[in-house]
A protein has these predicted regions:
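Pepsin/retropepsin-fold aspartyl endopeptidases
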Residues: 12-13, 18-330
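Bacterial N-terminal signal peptides that target proteins for export
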Residues: 1-9
Length: 330
């Protein structure tokens, strides 16, 4: 008989994710580490564009195999905390579920929890990976999502314009002492301190699988002309009504200013409560798409740069880039 776990939040298409309580019995705890079994060396993974609708790019895909099954189309999600796949893909991977959880976001949705013996993303191979299984689709046009934090044993260079994910080993003195100690946590969301419109301070989620950016109702305020009539937001766990913000929203992060084309005002109180901090917004894929993100989960830092700045040295030889923003990993 399945055991029910604490509610989980998954940030996928403005859905929040995360597992907070351990499961009884022999199953590893929610923060158990997946084992990296491929050599600890540089990798360059090719990403493919994800178009759930013909004219709207909403993320990037990695191709992966779970337990040696058929290749799966997995959306790379910096807001997810573990792999989530739909019913159709489940039949080909042979995972047995030992517990249940709730994926909660705009609504809630039950999921079964199992463990994959192997997960292969090109030449990169892991074992003992936590997987959430849901009935129906996770996202139309894909088999599921894969968390960016799965690769957190490496320094990550996520080049969205070039559609490449670079995995860079840390220096030897920082290299794990033995293969058995190499692992990646699967509960890390990218939360960065930000100032919105020059006055509202808080934390912002960087979510490569969100189809648009969002701000809290508190930040959006209620002046007439700033919010358009309500629009329905569909997501994996349900739907909600948000308001399209008609005025520009400026996100300032570590000296870098990002101005998304589309921003929706939503109730982000659940996200704030479950992250344990004041979340004022979400930067989705369309806003992040022009940039290169360099992410160190180990040092809790992220750098957001335009491709041009990557090759522009300062006069004194230093790299011409904004300072990295500290990550509040939750």
């Amino acid at each position: 008989m399945w055991r029910r776990e604490a509610a989980a939040f998954l940030v996928t298409w403005l859905i929040v994710g995360g597992l907070r309580a351990s499961e009884a019995g022999s199953t590893p705890a929610p923060d158990a580490r997946a084992d990296l079994v491929s050599p600890y060396q540089p990798y360059d993974l090719k990403l493919r564009p994800f178009y759930p609708a013909p004219s709207r790019a909403a993320g990037v895909l990695l191709q992966g195999c779970i337990n040696g099954g058929r290749p799966l189309r997995l959306v790379l999600d910096s807001g997810a905390e573990f792999i989530v796949i739909g019913a159709k893909a489940v039949r080909s991977i042979g995972i047995s579920a030992r517990s249940e959880m709730e994926l909660v976001g705009l609504g809630s949705r039950p999921a079964r929890v199992g463990w994959a013996e192997t997960v292969e993303i090109g030449p990169v191979r892991f074992r003992n990976c936590r997987v959430a299984l849901v009935d129906g689709n996770v996202i139309d046009g894909a088999d599921g999502v894969i968390p960016l934090s799965l690769f957190s044993d490496f320094l990550l260079r996520l080049n969205l314009p070039e559609k490449r994910l670079g995995l860079i080993p840390y220096p030897r003195e920082q290299d794990p002492a033995s293969p058995s100690s190499r692992g990646v946590t699967q509960r890390d969301l990218l939360l960065v301190a930000a100032v919105l419109n020059g006055k509202q301070s808080g934390h912002v989620v960087l979510d490569t699988a969100a189809f648009c950016s969002a701000i809290s109702h508190e930040v959006a305020g209620s002046p007439r002309g700033h919010l358009a009539p309500g629009i329905r937001i569909e997501a994996v766990t349900g739907a909600a009504t948000g308001q399209l913000v008609s005025s520009a929203v400026h996100f300032q992060i570590a000296g870098q200013e990002l101005i998304p084309n589309e921003v929706v005002a939503l109730d982000l109180s659940n996200l704030s409560r479950h992250c344990g901090m004041h979340v004022v917004g979400v930067l989705g894929f369309p806003a992040l798409r022009p940039y290169v993100l360099t992410i160190s989960y180990r040092n809790a830092l992220v750098k957001i740069e335009s491709p041009k700045r990557l090759s522009m040295p300062e006069e004194d030889g230093r790299h011409n880039a904004k300072s990295p923003a500290p990550l509040a990993l939750r």
